[in-house]
Swiss-Prot record:
This is Carboxypeptidase E. Disulfide bonds: none annotated. Sorting receptor that directs prohormones to the regulated secretory pathway. Also acts as a prohormone processing enzyme in neuro/endocrine cells, removing dibasic residues from the C-terminal end of peptide hormone precursors after initial endoprotease cleavage. Glycans are attached at residues 139, 390. Its EC number is 3.4.17.10. It comes from Homo sapiens. GO terms for cellular component: extracellular exosome; extracellular space; Golgi apparatus; plasma membrane; secretory granule membrane; transport vesicle membrane. It is linked to BDV syndrome: An autosomal recessive disorder characterized by obesity, intellectual disability, and hypogonadotropic hypogonadism. Additional variable features include central hypothyroidism, hypotonia, and developmental delay. Gene3D superfamilies: Carboxypeptidase-like, regulatory domain, Zn peptidases. Binds 1 zinc ion per subunit.
Amino acid sequence: MAGRGGSALLALCGALAACGWLLGAEAQEPGAPAAGMRRRRRLQQEDGISFEYHRYPELREALVSVWLQCTAISRIYTVGRSFEGRELLVIELSDNPGVHEPGEPEFKYIGNMHGNEAVGRELLIFLAQYLCNEYQKGNETIVNLIHSTRIHIMPSLNPDGFEKAASQPGELKDWFVGRSNAQGIDLNRNFPDLDRIVYVNEKEGGPNNHLLKNMKKIVDQNTKLAPETKAVIHWIMDIPFVLSANLHGGDLVANYPYDETRSGSAHEYSSSPDDAIFQSLARAYSSFNPAMSDPNRPPCRKNDDDSSFVDGTTNGGAWYSVPGGMQDFNYLSSNCFEITVELSCEKFPPEETLKTYWEDNKNSLISYLEQIHRGVKGFVRDLQGNPIANATISVEGIDHDVTSAKDGDYWRLLIPGNYKLTASAPGYLAITKKVAVPYSPAAGVDFELESFSERKEEEKEELMEWWKMMSETLNF
């Protein structure tokens, strides 16, 4: 079972069926219109994709529809509940759903963190349906992705905020209504501020990764964290995610770490140790979006400052400083590299534009997903072939390490080049290997570590052999 508070698929679907909507019957919740009131239901439909806004009951229905169509490669689970009790639903697509396969990287998309930024929510619903459709058609790219990657899609991290924003009359929505969760908390300012810690560690020495290691209990006890924030923190800690994107709205740009500036100034390029690969990852998204990558595109609003934008990408701190954001939290608390993608100048654009947004972003969403198969991957084992979990894999010249998962598997995103990788673990002798990294696929580098106890036994045997040889030579 993936994710804290997750429920088994059959239990979830059983509950949904009991509510009478699994196969299309009406579902209702307080303050929401009945799903049967279809609002020009199926306004624009193409290959099973309904280009319309999905309220909470309709979102659940859409995900279950994908699962019913592609049961062999999909699973629905929840990582927790919002403040008002709505489930934070995830649909997983994999050739072995529900299972972490050793050596297979884990990917996630998260949408609708700000409830009134609605395009990402809909694009992820569309993406789930598209992946299912194309898999069944035998699309080689999609089949290979699903067979080699465990894909997790959370359309809405802030379902309460979305319902508030969507409940406003008319198509023109307020710029701020629904942005925060039901407690009034901005979720993208609510994560533990690990940037401050790593900036101190850069100067004084200290860890450069996994800065919340073994601190789940402290997270649970922190009353300043929203339930949505806590749920995602546990999700990040429970699954060995490698790559992620957080979909927002209000501009057109792919934003990469660090989001918070080192000096505390409002605008300052704040590079992470992995600045090169983050720039490449951001371009992998923006380059396939014609509007985002257009160098002649005017700013979304007259007085907007997009001077930091290059090829549809920007460093977060150079644009504006964001403390407590989810993007940097992923990078500094886990092995997961995340960017933030702003999808639209309008936060809640008219429904009839959703199909155009899908067409503009479909190839970008797939291109970004493919980036997970870059860099280096492999296993860390002992001399008997047993996996070594939590081994550290460091790259010479890059002050950010990753660690191996429970099966000893690891993934390290890198741009093409020649590198020295070192694997180390407590009680073992470290090993360094050289590797030439292509653009893709990821180069395979395995490590077999010798324990100190094995080395002592080996040295003892060597000493005994030497003593025996000397005794025979000197006849004593």
